């Protein structure tokens, strides 16, 4: 993320740059893997990513991992997670349910005027929908963690947005725009007064392309 905020001097992620100054920015915090199925487990269960194995695909193992959702659920929090694509991919839904996420919402549950892309609904519709969901949950007066996985900054990088000729940078800029609008919508709502918002990458991506993961 550090490399793409101003890639080559280009303002690829101006909203993330803005948010850096409004919250706590961890300069040397890096995503734990190169794939979502590994990175999610690292984030939500504190289990280091494996290079050749996806723990998410091993229910007998993953259900016994520590879990942020399970801990919060035990403390009285209502847990929910959302994704604009298919949560059955790489066994995500099974892992989520097994580790304490009580309510999952994904592509099969959603209907928007905008048709889904290759991976699912793009970040524009999902970020707007998610902001509304958080606002509604906040209005109930009960504690909750609500998670969402974005998808537009993923190959094939086809997004309804045109800012940069480079498809990858353009997709990164699109996701940045969507997240920025989501944050602004939350800021303008009563939910913001009692909300902790955490933005984290699920996995790494070398940029520029010549840069190795190491």
Label every PLM stretch briefly.
Residues 1-214:
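Solvent-exposed soluble domains appended to multi-pass membrane proteins
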């Amino acid at each position: 993320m550090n490399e793409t905020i101003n890639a080559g001097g280009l303002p690829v992620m101006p909203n993330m740059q803005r948010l850096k100054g409004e919250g706590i920015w961890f300069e040397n915090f890096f995503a734990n893997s190169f794939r979502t199925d590994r990175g999610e487990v690292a984030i939500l269960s504190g289990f280091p990513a494996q290079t050749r194995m996806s723990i998410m695909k091993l229910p007998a193992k993953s259900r016994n991992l520590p879990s942020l959702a399970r801990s919060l659920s035990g403390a009285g929090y209502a847990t929910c997670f959302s994704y604009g694509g298919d949560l059955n991919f790489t066994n995500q839904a099974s892992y989520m349910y097994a580790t304490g996420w009580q309510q999952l919402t994904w592509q099969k549950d959603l209907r928007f005027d905008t048709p889904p892309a290759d991976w699912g609904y793009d970040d524009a519709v999902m970020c707007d929908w998610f902001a509304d969901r958080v606002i509604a949950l906040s209005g109930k007066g009960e504690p909750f963690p609500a998670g969402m996985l974005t998808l537009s900054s993923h190959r094939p990088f086809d997004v309804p947005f045109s800012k940069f000729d480079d498809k990858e940078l353009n997709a990164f800029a699109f996701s940045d725009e969507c997240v920025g609008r989501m944050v602004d919508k939350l800021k303008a709502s009563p939910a913001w007064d009692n909300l902790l918002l955490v933005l984290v990458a699920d996995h790494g991506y070398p940029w520029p392309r010549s840069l190795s993961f190491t």
